[in-house]
Amino acid sequence: FFNNMAIAMERLKRDGKISKALVLDIDLHFGDGTVNILGGRGYATLVNPSSNSPSDFIRQVDKALAAETYDVIGISAGFDYAREDWGGVLGESDYTDIGRMVRETARKSGAGFFAILEGGYNHRVLGHNCMALLEGMREG
């Protein structure tokens, strides 16, 4: 199988563009493929917030972003934690906040940042939530 996040991180590492990376996996489902590939590499920290509370979820994201300085932050952007999806937790404004937090953290440290769409099951809201994350990533 292919794992888009692992391919992106491995390429950046192989090309000498990064030493330390954060994978922020905001998908409801644990990213075991990402962990299986990157978990033992030593340069990548993988964080998969999990909560039934939007504020607690955001606190976990904030804690992960503040823990260390990274050369790149990659968001595994699954949107099944959305209120209108299986997870039933995060709203559009939460996704905007996550994007903004990643952008601000990356800019402070000079890191790069990107997101890879990993999924979401409710197609009526998937595009809106994806746009909300991207809006946060591009603001300012």
Give the location of each predicted region.
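A general "terminal functional-core" signal
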Residues: F1-G140
